Each structure stands twice: as C-alpha cells, then as structure tokens.
Curated annotation (Swiss-Prot):
HAMAP family tied to this protein: PGAM_GpmA
Stated role: Catalyzes the interconversion of 2-phosphoglycerate and 3-phosphoglycerate.
Family matches, as SMART domains: PGAM
PANTHER family linked: PHOSPHOGLYCERATE MUTASE
Residues of the active site: 11 (tele-phosphohistidine intermediate), 89 (proton donor/acceptor)
GO molecular function, one term: phosphoglycerate mutase activity
Name of the protein this chain belongs to: 2,3-bisphosphoglycerate-dependent phosphoglycerate mutase
Origin species: Klebsiella pneumoniae subsp. pneumoniae (strain ATCC 700721 / MGH 78578)
Binding-site residues for substrate, renumbered to this chain: 10-17, 23-24, 62, 89-92, 100, 116-117, 185-186
NCBIfam families according to UniProt: pgm_1, PRK14115.1
UniProt-listed CDD domains: HP_PGM_like
Lineage: Bacteria, Pseudomonadati, Pseudomonadota, Gammaproteobacteria, Enterobacterales
Top EC class, one word: isomerase
Catalytic function, reaction form: (2R)-2-phosphoglycerate = (2R)-3-phosphoglycerate
GO biological process, one term: glycolytic process
Length: 250
C-alpha cells in the first residue's frame, strides 16, 4: 500500500509565547528558544530521512522563520514556498497583546479556557479603528472587509483552513509531492480536527507543542492512517501540557 506523508510543524516559541501573551495575528518573531526549537525540528526531520518538494506557511514571521530554520537544517532553503493568510493563527480579537494569566485572574480560568479552546466561542471583538485590526496592515490589502476578522473562534478558523487544505494543499499531495506545513497552534488544530474527524469536546483538550514535527500518514485514498510526533515522547508531552497551562491564573 502506497503511503503519503505530510509534516506539520507549529512555529517555535515566539517572544509573546515566552511572555504568555495572546498573539493571534500580531506579527511577533521567534524567541531564542523558538529558533533553537525550529532548528531541532529540522535536525529531527533530517535524521529521519525526510525531504520535501513544497512548503506552506502563513504570512506571520514566527511561522515563516520557523520554516526557514527547518529547511536550512535540511539543506533545502531553495524549496518553493507558498505563504497564505489562511494558515494564520486564529485571530484573538481584543485579547491580542494581553497576558493570559492576568486575563485569567480577571475573568476566571474557565472563561479564558473557553476563549482559548472553545470550539465556537469568540473572544471580544476588535473595532475597525483599533490599530490591531488587520485592515491597517499592508499584507492584507487585497482582502475584503468580509475576509478580515475582528475576532475568530476555532470554528471560524476551520472555515478558512479546511477549504485551503482541500483546494490547494491536498491536490499537491495527490500529485505525489512531499509537503511540509509550518503554521500555528490553532490553524493546525483546525486542520487536525478535520483530518481526524474529532468532536468538539476532543479538540478542546488538544494542545500542539511548539517546534515538534507532527507526521501524518495517508492511504491511497488520502484518508489518515496514523499520526505521530518525532522526538522524545516525555518531552513532547511536557511541552503540550505547558501549552494547556498558559491560560491559567498564577
């Protein structure tokens, strides 16, 4: 049976991950640790014999720079890359820039968990005159007002990620190309929910660690057979637990 592999990588730790702040579409860069995580992901992929024909990422530098570091370790810096806003992190609305633990102290752990992980729950909206509104950013100049979010739930994130998967990424896999996607915690959760047909309760508890390659294997009908992380299982579990705890009061 022919097996097709897809590699997903959540960006390495960002400066705002390190400061435990809601990031969303705010364009922060990787922290020093995040750069190291991205390089380590590349080394793991190289050790396992992976190479690629095409890469996808978002238009946010923490994902772009993660991909650069991964490809550099693979000696594939030349690889063609498509960047799309549809792979951006979920837009966190008026929460963007706020400290997660301080927000939990103000609103309660459960409310923040729902904002972070609830399937159809949207954080408080930005107004369009807010400097954080993506309509003020030149990289989104060609998008319509209807496409530009003022806040997003995971359900709304799925509404942009899944069509992009089906219309753009999946056809490339079906053509036989080897693909890597470097994206974000929630855009990847959106894709994982779709691929694994996960329920809303299941996705609430799913946390994707930073900078760890997640490999999906598909059968000849492009149905997922299995998926697994590359690396030390205990370390990966600890990183996923740390992601889950970010939204709790101190």
């Amino acid at each position: 049976m022919a097996v097709t592999k897809l590699v997903l990588v959540r960006h390495g730790e960002s400066q705002w991950n390190n400061e435990n702040r809601f990031t969303g579409w705010y364009d922060v860069d990787l922290s020093e640790k995040g750069v190291s995580e991205a390089k380590a992901a590349g080394k793991l992929l190289k050790a396992e014999g992976f190479s690629f024909d095409f890469a996808y990422t978002s238009v946010l530098k923490r994902a772009i720079h993660t991909l650069w570091n991964v490809l550099d370790e693979l000696d594939q810096a030349w690889l063609p890359v498509e960047k799309s806003w549809k792979l951006n992190e979920r837009h966190y609305g008026a929460l963007q820039g706020l400290n997660k633990a301080e927000t939990a102290e103000k609103y309660g752990d459960e409310q923040v968990k729902q904002w972070r992980r609830g399937f159809a729950v949207t954080p408080p909206e930005l107004t369009k005159d807010d400097e954080r509104y993506p309509g003020h950013d030149p990289r989104y100049a060609k998008l319509t007002d209807a496409e530009l979010p003022t806040t997003e739930s995971l359900a709304l994130t799925i509404d942009r990620v899944v069509p992009y998967w089906n219309e753009t990424i999946l056809p490339r896999l079906k053509s036989g190309e080897r693909v890597i996607i470097a994206a974000h915690g929630n855009s990847l959760r959106a894709l994982v929910k779709y691929l694994d047909n996960m329920g809303e309760d299941e996705i609430l508890e799913l946390n994707i660690p930073t900078g760890v390659p997640l490999v999906y294997e598909f059968d000849e009908n492009f149905k997922p057979i299995k998926h697994y992380y590359l690396g030390n299982a205990e370390e990966i579990a600890a990183k996923a637990a740390a992601v889950a705890n970010q939204g709790k009061a101190k």
